[in-house]
Structure formats: structure tokens, C-alpha cells
Amino acid sequence: MTSNGEGGEVVAKRRRKGIKELVQVALRGGCLAASATAMAVMLTATEEGVADIYGFKLTLSSNWSFSPSYQYVVGACAGTVLYSLLQLCLGVYRLVTGSPITPSRFQAWLCFTSDQLFCYLMMSAGSAGSGVTNLNKTGIRHTPLPDFCKTLSSFCNHVALSLLLVFLSFIFLASSSFFTVLVLSTP
């Protein structure tokens, strides 16, 4: 028994629960950081250049807002940033006050559903952006147009980094959802 009368088993169980809750808060923080950085990198994706196509000089200009897919990525990131910030603030508050992060099964189901919703939102945004980025990188094969990224490499690098962070944010949300399932599976 410990000094306050608790058995070693109870103390170990409480310590494991505290570690799980700390991991949940860390996952929320990671998701917030990845989503916010993805949005910031995408918002700074802009470049101008000159392409040489069969001896003709064409001025190319690109901005993230020219593509509806990239607009969708920015919108999905903005929503995920707000959701992650709310969950992070709630988690930190509950850690500081010593209350459980998911006090009820209803709240655990609500967190699970919300995590899944934003998880799929980020996956669909990343997939939509990846399709456009792949087209920019490879060019249009059945026409003589070269790939876009030779001329505007900085723009393409910004977009690729942003999409990588979007998929990282998806992994954080999926992991957070997994931890919520662990909470739901314990009696």
C-alpha cells in the first residue's frame, strides 16, 4: 500500500491512464501543428516564370487560389486547425484540472465521430490536391505541353510539402481516433 492507502495495482492503472491522456493531448497538438503549417505553406505557394515551348516564351503565373483543389485543401486545413485547437484546449484544461479527457461514453463517441469526420476530410483534401499536383508534375501526356513544375519548381515544392503535412495531419487524427476507441473499449 502507498502512503494514501492505495494499492500498487490502482496506482499503476492510474499512471497508464495518465499516459494515455497525455498521448491524446500530444496527438491533438501534433495535428494542430501539421494542419496549421500545411495551410501556411499552401497560402505562400505562388510563383511566376517563363516557359519555352517550341521556341515561344510563355509567361506562367501560379497561385494556390487558381485551383479549386488547392482551395479545398486550405479550407479543410482551416477547419481542422479550429477543431484541433478546440480539442487541444479542452484536453490541456482537463489535464491541468485532473479530470478525465473523455468523462463519458457519449463524449468519447462524439470525439470518435468528429475525429473520423476530420480524418476523412483531410484525406479527401490531400487526395484532391495530389491529383492536381501530379498533373502539374508530369504534364499532359497526349499534348506537347511540358510539365508545369520545371518552370515553377518553388510553387510545386510548396504544394508538395503542404500535401505531405496534410497527410501527416490525417495520421494524427487517425491515431487520436484509435485512442478514443481504446477509451470506448474499456469498461
From Swiss-Prot:
- Could you confirm whether the keyword Membrane appears in this record? yes
Attached carbohydrates are found at 63, 136
List the Extracellular topological domains: 46-71, 129-162
Q: Which residues cross the membrane?
A: 25-45, 72-92, 108-128, 163-183
Cytoplasmic side, ranges: 1-24, 93-107, 184-187
User: InterPro entries from the xrefs?
Assistant: CASP/CASPL, CASP_dom
Where does the record place it? Answer: Cell membrane
Location (main, coarse): membrane
UniProt superkingdom: Eukaryota
Give the GO cellular component terms, alphabetically. Answer: plasma membrane
What does the sequence similarity comment in the record state about its family? Answer: Belongs to the Casparian strip membrane proteins (CASP) family.
* Name by which UniProt lists this protein: CASP-like protein 3A2
